[in-house]
């Protein structure tokens, strides 16, 4: 039995299955930390959220876990999935309609995640930058993000704040 479990774990790793776990924000409770609460109160727009992340966080891969918004706030190191969870939580707190997009690149073992905000049009952010609201579709955002990264995508999946599936796209 142990050999079977080990074999399954190895197969998942070798097939490039990312462990970009979807953090269930409905289970997240804002901690009783005045500085954290003040921080989220002051980050009122997606652009402010992204600027805060760029100024305060350092990119570090966490392929096996997704940090809560508070954990990222405390340790200040995370990957695109951690940044995405942080930004979605704070934007939703300020009543923005938010989505997250998981993108599978053709030549990558791991998926990439970005945050999408519904302003007049769609805007988005990754772990580095905020992109102005000028996009009409999720596909446009995926195409542009991949263009910037010089990557080809094979699949993308869009979820809403409550982890509901919104859209899937394939580029095979």
How should each PLM-predicted stretch be described?
Residues 18-172:
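A structural boundary/capping signal
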Residues 4-14:
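Sec-dependent N-terminal signal peptides
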């Amino acid at each position: 039995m142990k050999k079977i479990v080990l074999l399954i774990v190895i197969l998942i790793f070798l097939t490039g299955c990312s462990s970009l776990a979807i953090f269930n924000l409905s289970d997240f409770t804002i901690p009783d930390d005045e500085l954290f609460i003040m921080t989220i109160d002051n980050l009122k727009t997606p652009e402010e959220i992204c600027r805060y992340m760029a100024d305060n966080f350092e990119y570090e891969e966490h392929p096996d876990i997704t940090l809560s918004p508070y954990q990222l706030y405390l340790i200040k190191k995370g990957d695109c999935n951690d940044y995405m969870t942080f930004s979605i939580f704070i934007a939703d707190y300020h009543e923005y309609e938010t989505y997250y997009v998981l993108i599978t690149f053709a030549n990558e073992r791991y998926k990439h995640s970005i945050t999408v905000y519904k302003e007049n049009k769609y805007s988005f952010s990754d772990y580095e930058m905020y992109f102005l609201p000028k996009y009409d579709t999720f596909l446009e955002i995926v195409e542009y993000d991949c263009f910037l990264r010089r990557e080809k995508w094979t699949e993308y999946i869009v979820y809403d704040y409550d982890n509901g599936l919104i859209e899937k796209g394939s580029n095979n």
